[in-house]
Amino acid sequence: MFYSLSVKNFILIDELEIEFSKGLCVITGETGAGKSILLDAILFCLGYKTSNNIIKHGKDYTVVNIIFSLNEKIKKFLIQNFIEPEELLLVKCLQKAEGRKSFFINNQIVTKTLIKQLANYLFELHGQNNNITLLEASTQRDILDSYGDLLEFRVKLAKCYQIWQNTRKEIEEITVKQNVIEQEIDYLNFVTEELTKLNIQIGEEETLTNIRQDLQNKNKDLQLIRDIIAQINNPEINISINRAEKLLARQRDNDRFKAIATSLEEAYNNLEVARQELSNLLDSFTYEEYNLEETEERLFLIKAISRKYNVPANELGIFLDKSLEKLVILKNKIANSHKLQAQEVLLQEQYYKLANDLSARRLIAAKHLEESLNQELKQLKMEKANFKIEIKTAIDPTASGNDDIVFKASTNPGMKAEEINKIASGGELSRFMLALKTSLFDKMIKPSIIFDEIDVGIGGEAADKVGDRLKKLSSVTQVIVITHQPQVAGKADLHIKIEKTQLEQETKIKVKALNLAERQRELARMISGKTITDASLKVAKELLYPVACPHDQK
């Protein structure tokens, strides 16, 4: 609820501070006294659109502070927006002549958007030009569902709707991308088959590179052996040695040639040994595990695949694993599409079953609310008015159900019921809202409700009934009323008077909380005008009797 309001340099106000109370708070004053300025100050502080010229003439800034009491919803909102709750809630708006507005919550600077979101938790405003929320379809739906205790059921429906819509969205995404997904599956099938077949191991490229180098070195040795064998296997060598031996055999008795013959024989034997060793060495190369041609082919293939997929050879195995994982996911998407379609049908059936149930409950609640509100309108002296709730099947289902809900009314007999905003004046709309609030009573109630001149165009018994309903409503929430009716003001728990004083150089506004005697004179003024008579004082005293002597009331 509103705890206090302080204003400085705002339009005609130099500086003022008002403390509010629980229950019914009324604000009165002569026409043109500036009652609406207080309302403008509240709206200014809470981020609503106000007139441009709000800074008092001759001043370079204006500031408005409002202190509110807290409830659990407000505390939760503050915590969700990283603002530490304190014992009371301080909201401030500062505007300098040359700059934009600055908003604060508990002295922490915040955005205008956040302030307006917070305001939804703090109060409602109903008046000549401020019944916009009543005209919104969402508000009318919420009013009906609150009256019929259907909000929890609606939460259940909303959850079902959300799951249904998420499933539909997933199906649509798969359908739109199905061709792309199928192409990607074909590509990944090819990739995984190719890489699986190649079976490239981690470190294989490095191993094969080393083997190739080794084989290249061995091939050089092999070629050398073959060249040597080719030389020593030359038939001319054996022929030459045989001829030399035959020539030496003729000189076997000559001691000078014996040593040469022996050396020549040893040379022949050594040559045979060399041939054998070279042959054995050659045979050992024949059974190597790798050959250079195969190794180079494998290396070429690995490098080509690495370039093809732009993946380092050492990471081709990881690339294969990831491709296999992605392939499984995409195949599951296609497979799940059919499951999702079946699931979507079931969810749709479940949604419409719940929505139809909600519609049936709304029809029952609408009938009872119509009866209750029409009875309240009679109490507010709008006997000729007739309130109706029209419920039609919506074109598109929503999280709130499958109904279009429209509040309609006729204000005179024989008139066709039209949408409530088309047939009701600002004051009538306010009384419609008062009737709704009284019918709902302890439901959909915010900490504070402000009614701006709800009693315009009525008087006498009708004004008294409006006052009774406001008083009843104030038992469950703080009600602040700007009024011209003494019957309404007489029922207040707190009476605030606004006076405007015209000086030579400027106009000033004074705000005061009245005591009982002051209230009597103010009510008398409201009854008889500027000239207060004994008769008006007597009537004022009678209006205040329930306040002055509460224990005498039954």
UniProtKB/Swiss-Prot annotation:
Origin species, per record, is Rickettsia prowazekii (strain Madrid E)
* GO molecular function terms noted in the UniProt entry: ATP binding
Q: What family classification does the UniProt entry report for this protein?
A: Belongs to the RecN family.
What GO biological process terms are annotated to this protein in UniProt?
DNA recombination; DNA repair; SOS response
Q: Which domain of life is it from?
A: Bacteria
Q: Which UniProt keywords apply?
A: ATP-binding, DNA damage, DNA repair, Nucleotide-binding
* Name of the protein described by the UniProt record: DNA repair protein RecN
Record flagged with keyword RNA-binding = no
Binding-site residues for ATP, renumbered to this chain: G29, E30, T31, G32, A33, G34, K35, S36
Give the NCBIfam families listed for this entry: recN
Q: Which SUPFAM superfamilies match?
A: P-loop containing nucleoside triphosphate hydrolases
- PANTHER family hit by this protein: DNA REPAIR PROTEIN RECN (PTHR11059:SF0)
Q: Name one GO cellular component term.
A: bacterial nucleoid
- State what this protein does: May be involved in recombinational repair of damaged DNA.
